């Protein structure tokens, strides 16, 4: 029996024959096919163990947070889909709604601390705007197409938003005691903002809707606990508005994670997150301390002088990540460090 016939018999193809072709022809074709399969199998088996050997568990997902309206109350979820533009939970996406003033500029808790008391939730086909001592407002998930498209600015960059209507505008303006506020929604057909326009270290493909710069912010419980050990009054993770909070790792371990794997999701670290007055707003009361924890962070979390061109003189706390591979992550998922 020839080598080709032996291989076919071994794989159960002894009766295989291409009608109308000489024996030598179909044996050659079959042998080439088997060789390709064998080479592919060997390559896959060699690559897969190497990748697995590079994995090192560095923590566990402890909390997941989505902030549907920029600067407003966060929504704690047990699982979320990781997309290129941030976390998604059902119809709610991270920072896909925005409060603007009459000039179209973003309004955040830096200027209006009480924004952190406003929540946006979703049930079935209805959104609910709510805040303490204020009657809830029900809104459709998608604003009517007849509502105007408004030109908005987030950190000086132009972006569109679909106006959510007069009722929403009046509700937000009344709660904040501001005139002429509007609530807008980012729609899929709209052009996102380029993260690279904010910081050159981002890739061309990194994009966001109304987030400051990055689709994902990662913070560890250990880092938060270290900060709290230096403060007279403890602060929460939500003071820093992270998307993914990690437990079971060392203090500031997230600063050195270049790429992590959570389930099927791969995230790549881009840069540290600089901190501003927003961190001084109590997420439970909407009152700004105007000092802490920012002053304490400045005492020990400034960047290396060689990185001042990137971070300036603002303290850094937490890390910005961008998406490498999409998927779903859940509270309790192990976090693996991919090979450096």
Swiss-Prot record:
PANTHER family: MITOCHONDRIAL AMIDOXIME-REDUCING COMPONENT 1, MOLYBDOPTERIN COFACTOR SULFURASE MOSC. It is found in: Mitochondrion outer membrane; Membrane. Its EC number is 1.7.-.-. It catalyses: N(omega)-hydroxy-L-arginine + 2 Fe(II)-[cytochrome b5] + 2 H(+) = L-arginine + 2 Fe(III)-[cytochrome b5] + H2O. This is Mitochondrial amidoxime-reducing component 1. The keyword Lyase does not apply. Residues 2-24 are mitochondrial matrix. It is an enzyme of class 1 (oxidoreductase). Signal peptide: none annotated. It comes from the Eukaryota. GO terms for molecular function: molybdenum ion binding; molybdopterin cofactor binding; nitrate reductase activity; nitrite reductase (NO-forming) activity; pyridoxal phosphate binding. Comprises two structural domains, the molybdenum cofactor/Moco sulfurase C-terminal (MOSC) domain and the MOSC N-terminal region, forming a cleft that accommodates Moco. The MOSC domain, which contains a large seven-stranded mostly antiparallel beta-barrel, engages multiple interactions with Moco both pterin ring and phosphate group, allowing for a tight coordination of Moco within the core of the enzyme. Keywords: Lipoprotein, Membrane, Metal-binding, Mitochondrion, Mitochondrion outer membrane, Molybdenum, Myristate, Oxidoreductase, Signal-anchor, Transmembrane, Transmembrane helix. The gene is Mtarc1. Residues 96-186 are annotated as: MOSC N-terminal region. Component of a complex composed of cytochrome b5, NADH-cytochrome b5 reductase and MTARC1. Its cofactor is Mo-molybdopterin. It comes from Mus musculus (Mouse).
